[in-house]
Every structure is written in structure tokens, then in C-alpha cells.
């Protein structure tokens, strides 16, 4: 990717979203996108490979989450089902001070994310505050090392909201938040997920709709506050939330 050609697109897009990059952040995001394209030749990381589309539909889409759920240095953040590192890696590039965990169920993608840690996050943040966890959300959500440990839990285009809630809310601390990054039409999903969110200890706090720059499409960002501990029965065993949503 020609960093000079796409740097301006990324910077202008971030400005339009109201997201400010910390020093070195823009360059780090572009390097991450380069690695995604390179590794995509060996494994399935993304169907979007045009450099301009990657900036808009991956980097800026990911960054839009920071416009709604601003994070502070030292806060613990987990990206559930991160895939190629969206939104988590982009957040870490733009906010190097966060303590980021990337949760991914495919081991080969975890290898890619570890390479990103060395090549991108290492030079930017000394490799600090960056962990890759191989596993399924249902299992990790029962692990005391992760359960109710995070200030912010996020997921992008992983599953419908009532399923995502069972994956993600058990990981958020009481008082923490869960940000679901969804497509343009989310109203029915939110209604269908109300009972699940309540059962898991959450409360809908905000739904913000925004338009990605340069015709990137409309997005809905759903922010849920964790108000009570999640009952010990949740998450259910691996595969059950998707097959039988709450």
C-alpha cells in the first residue's frame, strides 16, 4: 500500500469521525493494512483487498467505534472474534495506551495477530498491552482470568445482537461497557435482544448511527452498560448461544 497516497484518506476520514490519532498511529494503521493484504494471500483474512476500500471499510469502520466508546490509557479492552484485528488493532494503533486483548477462535489467525504485535505494536507501544488469546468466547467467558475483567468489550460483524450479548457481556466488569458494531438496520435486532441483555446484566445505553466517509456506508454502534454481574449459567457451552439464542 502506498502510504503517502492513503495517509491523507485515512487522516481526513478520522477527522470526519472526530477521532484523533496519537503520534505514529496513522502509520501503524497503514502498516497493519499492508500486513492484512500480504497474509491474505496465504489465509482468508478479508474479502476486501482494494487499498482504498480497506482504509474506508476496515480502518475507518473500526475507528468509528472510538467516536462512541472513547477509551482511556490503561483501560482493559477485549475484541471478541477479532479476525484480522478489526477493530482492536486499529484501536491500539490510535490509542497505544490501552491494554488490548484480541480473542480469536482460529489458530492460524492468531499467528497473524502475533506477527502484527511484533511488526506494528512493538515499535509503537513497545509490545506492551497487547495479548492474543486463542479460544471461543463461550469458554473464555467462563475463565476467571477473563470473566468480568474488561472495561470495554467489543465485537464487529460477528453475530446477531442477542448472540453477541451472551458472548460479550460476561467479559465486561460491572460498570464496564459492551460496544456492538453493526450494519445500517439494527432496530429489530435490538428489540429481539432486550431480554437477553437484561438477563446477562446489561442495559442499552446508546445507539448511534453514522455514515462512513467516502461512501463507505451506514453503520450502527450499539453501546450497552454492564450494571449487574452476569449469572453463572452464562455463557452457555460452546455453540449453544448461536443455535439457541436467549
From Swiss-Prot:
Keyword rRNA-binding on entry: no
Protein name: Ribosomal RNA small subunit methyltransferase G
Organism, as annotated: Symbiobacterium thermophilum (strain DSM 24528 / JCM 14929 / IAM 14863 / T)
Homology family: Belongs to the methyltransferase superfamily. RNA methyltransferase RsmG family.
Binding site for S-adenosyl-L-methionine: 81, 86, 137-138, 156
Domain of life the protein comes from: Bacteria
InterPro entries recorded: rRNA_ssu_MeTfrase_G, SAM-dependent_MTases_sf
A Gene Ontology term for the protein's cellular component: cytosol
Enzyme class: transferase
Its EC number(s): 2.1.1.-
Main location group: cytoplasm
A molecular-function term among this protein's GO annotations: rRNA (guanine-N7-)-methyltransferase activity
Keywords in alphabetical order: Cytoplasm, Methyltransferase, rRNA processing, S-adenosyl-L-methionine, Transferase
Pfam families: GidB
Residue numbers spanned by region Disordered: 221-246
Protein's job: Specifically methylates the N7 position of a guanine in 16S rRNA.
Gene: rsmG
Amino acid at each position: 500500500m502506498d502510504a503517502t497516497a492513503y495517509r491523507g484518506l485515512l487522516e481526513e476520514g478520522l477527522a470526519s469521525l472526530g477521532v484523533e490519532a496519537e503520534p505514529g498511529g496513522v502509520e501503524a494503521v497503514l502498516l497493519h493494512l499492508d500486513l492484512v493484504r500480504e497474509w491474505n494471500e496465504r489465509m482468508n483474512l478479508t474479502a476486501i483487498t482494494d487499498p482504498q476500500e480497506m482504509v474506508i471499510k476496515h480502518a475507518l469502520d473500526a475507528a468509528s467505534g472510538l467516536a462512541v466508546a472513547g477509551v482511556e490509557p490503561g483501560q482493559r479492552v477485549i475484541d471478541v472474534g477479532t479476525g484480522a484485528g478489526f477493530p482492536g488493532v486499529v484501536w491500539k494503533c490510535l490509542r497505544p495506551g490501552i491494554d488490548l486483548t484480541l480473542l480469536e477462535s482460529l489458530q492460524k489467525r492468531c499467528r497473524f495477530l502475533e506477527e502484527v504485535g511484533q511488526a506494528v505494536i512493538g515499535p509503537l507501544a513497545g509490545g506492551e498491552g497487547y495479548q492474543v488469546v486463542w479460544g471461543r468466547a463461550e469458554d473464555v467467558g467462563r475463565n476467571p482470568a477473563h470473566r468480568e475483567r474488561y472495561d470495554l468489550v467489543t465485537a464487529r460483524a460477528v453475530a446477531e445482537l442477542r448472540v453477541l450479548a451472551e458472548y460479550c457481556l460476561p467479559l465486561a466488569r460491572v460498570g464496564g461497557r459492551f460496544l456492538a458494531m453493526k450494519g445500517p438496520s439494527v432496530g429489530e435486532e435490538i428489540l429481539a435482544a432486550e431480554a437477553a441483555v437484561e438477563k446477562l446484566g446489561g442495559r442499552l445505553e446508546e445507539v448511534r448511527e453514522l455514515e462512513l466517509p467516502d461512501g463507505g456506508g451506514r453503520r450502527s454502534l450499539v453501546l450497552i452498560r454492564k450494571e449487574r454481574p452476569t449469572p453463572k449459567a452464562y455463557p452457555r457451552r460452546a455453540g449453544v448461544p448461536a443455535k439457541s439464542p436467549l
